[in-house]
Design a protein with these regions (language model features):
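Basic, Lys/Arg- and aromatic-enriched nucleic-acid-binding interface segment
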Residues: 1-15, 19, 67-68
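Short helix-to-turn junction characteristic of helix-turn-helix DNA-binding domains
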Residues: 4, 8, 90, 116-117
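Conserved tyrosine-mediated DNA breakage-rejoining catalytic core shared by Y-recombinases
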Residues: 11, 20-63
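Short, polar N-cap/turn motifs at the start of nucleic acid-interacting alpha helices
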Residues: 25-32, 102, 121-140, 147, ...
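Catalytic-site neighborhood detector that most strongly recognizes the C-terminal catalytic loop/helix
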Residues: 37-41, 58, 80, 130-155
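DNA/chromatin major-groove-contacting recognition/catalytic segments
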Residues: 49-52, 63, 119, 143-160
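Active-site/catalytic core of tyrosine-dependent DNA strand-transfer enzymes
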Residues: 54-100
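Short basic/aromatic active-site micro-motif
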Residues: 80-82, 98-120
Length: 160
């Protein structure tokens, strides 16, 4: 579950993307993940994207690879198996497991995007990292950045 959580929080991967990720998709030299359709699996948008690795995820994946040199997949668990493990973790954390407030694996991706927006990352950059086909889907996160909008206009000065 830890690797699944790390890929969601630090790379914004969809659950299916994280579970389909193979070590050959991890470029340790240039520090990025390649999320690409394959003959046995496809991305939601059917497009390839590159997601850079920050220091924390890079170091984590490096340690994980060194401790699992023989595995092909980064996460060797089925979708259903991961779903059960994730929900068990959510329950142990005392988070909602039912109803409107239910915490799902998608919350990891949402957290990734939300934090980028709150840090002032342009929506088109967030869209590219998430693999959104356009920024319309990404605009769902724009309500999180009102202070950044205020800061942007506060810097405007005209005349004396």
């Amino acid at each position: 579950v830890e690797t699944f959580v790390m890929l969601g929080l630090f790379a914004g991967l969809r659950a299916g993307e994280a579970l389909a990720l193979r070590w050959q998709d991890v470029n340790f030299d240039q520090r990025f993940l390649t999320i690409a359709p394959r003959h046995d699996w496809t991305t939601k948008t059917r497009r390839t994207r590159v997601v850079p690795l920050n220091d924390e995820l890079f170091a984590y994946l490096k340690r994980r690879r060194e401790s699992n040199p023989e595995t092909e997949r980064v996460i060797e668990v089925s979708y259903e198996g991961m779903k059960k493990r994730f929900q068990r973790l959510v329950k142990l954390a005392g988070l909602p497991t039912a109803g409107e407030e239910k915490v799902t694996a998608h919350a990891l991706r949402h957290t990734f995007a939300s934090h980028l927006v709150m840090a002032g990352t342009p929506l088109y950059t967030v869209a590219a990292l998430l693999g959104h086909g356009n920024t319309e889907t990404t605009r769902l996160y724009s309500h999180l950045a009102p202070s950044h909008l205020q800061e942007a206009v506060n810097g405007l000065k005209y005349g004396g």
